[in-house]
């Protein structure tokens, strides 16, 4: 019986070693996920960009990530009114900049 067990054990170990174990459910699958969000409002005038990191993206904590003028990334809760105000301001500013960049100055 021992001669049959050894090859089976070796094969089982080889299979386990070759194929990675599946990740546990509920883990942060994405590398960029926020571990927590700040409830304290962030001044809108220091924010230059934003992006969403939601549960659908593999993140356990849904968040809006604001990038500041100095390059810091701050995680905020997407359901807060102050977060919506900053996002609206950034979208409005972005729309203005796109409108200005498409206009051509007259050639004199």
Swiss-Prot record:
- What InterPro entries does the annotation carry? Chemokine_b/g/d, Chemokine_CC_CS, Chemokine_CC_DCCL, Chemokine_IL8-like_dom, Interleukin_8-like_sf
What is the designated name of this protein? C-C motif chemokine 19
Q: Identify one Gene Ontology CC term for this UniProt entry.
A: external side of plasma membrane
Residues in the signal sequence? 1-25
Q: Which UniProt keywords apply?
A: Chemotaxis, Cytokine, Disulfide bond, Glycoprotein, Inflammatory response, Secreted, Signal
User: Which residues get glycosylated?
Assistant: 100
Record-linked PROSITE patterns: SMALL_CYTOKINES_CC
Gene encoding this polypeptide? Answer: Ccl19
Q: Which organism is it from?
A: Mus musculus (Mouse)
């Amino acid at each position: 019986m021992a001669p049959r067990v050894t090859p089976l054990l070796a094969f089982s170990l080889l299979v386990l070693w070759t194929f990675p174990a599946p990740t546990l459910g509920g883990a942060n699958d994405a590398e960029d996920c926020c571990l927590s969000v700040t409830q304290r409002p962030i001044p809108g005038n220091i924010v230059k960009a934003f992006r969403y990191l939601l549960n659908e993206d593999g993140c356990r904590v849904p968040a809006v990530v604001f990038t500041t003028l100095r390059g810091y990334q701050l995680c905020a809760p997407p359901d807060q009114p102050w977060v919506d105000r900053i996002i609206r301001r950034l979208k409005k500013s972005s729309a203005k900049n796109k409108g200005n960049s498409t206009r051509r100055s007259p050639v004199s």
